[in-house]
A protein has these predicted regions:
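Glycine-rich, flexible loop segments associated with nucleotide phosphate handling
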Residues: 21-30, 77, 148-155
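Active-site-proximal segments of metallohydrolase catalytic domains
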Residues: 43-112, 116
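The catalytic-center signature of Zn2+-dependent metalloproteases
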Residues: 114-186
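Surface-exposed helix-capping loop/turn segments at secondary-structure junctions
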Residues: 41-47, 139-142
Length: 186
């Protein structure tokens, strides 16, 4: 059974001046296709249950680069419920991550994903954030160990801005056994 996602397309504003939005329901669907391709290795699928265009979030550009603060502000705009909340936001200057999530879906299953400009990059970042909601941690790379680095750089959960989409057997088992997947019949 696919896991339902409630999508909030959330443009930014600063001092009342609305910035042009980058996400649309169509780009969200295309990115979700990439997400589902990546997670198909674990036989986990996601579906958009709702896709809502949000009122712009009026927040100074300088405040957006703190990923946990931004996630808290986005999540505070909606009461927690039984849905997984995904906030799709414009690209953010000086943000060193593709988005942010509440690890292990605590206090609620919520993530934001910033715009990267193409379906594959958007979907890979989104798949990474869903990994955190399914209890997966970042993969650290020891670049002095070339063999390990060559393998891990391709992993979906590699920390930072990467293009990896691989999952290990251990990651697949952890995701399938996560509270989030079990909640939706996985």
């Amino acid at each position: 059974m696919p896991i339902p996602l409630r999508i909030y397309i959330t443009p930014f504003a600063e001092r009342g001046s609305v910035e042009p939005g980058q996400w649309s329901s169509e780009t969200a669907k295309k990115a979700l296709d990439v997400v589902n391709t990546i997670w198909s290795k674990a036989k986990i699928a996601f579906v958009i249950s709702d896709c809502l265009m949000e009122k712009p979030l009026d927040m100074a550009k300088s405040a957006r680069s703190n990923d946990q603060r931004l996630l808290g502000v986005l999540a505070s705009r909606h009461d927690p419920d039984n849905a997984i909340h995904i906030y799709l936001v414009n690209s953010i200057e000086n943000l060193s991550a593709g988005g942010s999530s509440y690890p292990n879906s605590e206090p609620e299953p919520a993530s934001f994903v910033q715009w990267y400009g193409n379906d594959h990059a958007n979907g890979r970042a989104w798949a990474h954030e869903l990994g955190h909601l399914m209890s997966l941690d970042h993969v650290e790379i020891d670049y002095s160990n070339e063999k390990q680095a060559a393998q891990r750089v391709k992993n979906l959960m590699t920390k930072g801005l990467s293009a990896g989409s691989d999952l290990t057997g251990q990651q697949i088992d952890a995701a399938k056994g996560s509270k989030l997947v079990k909640r939706f019949g996985g």
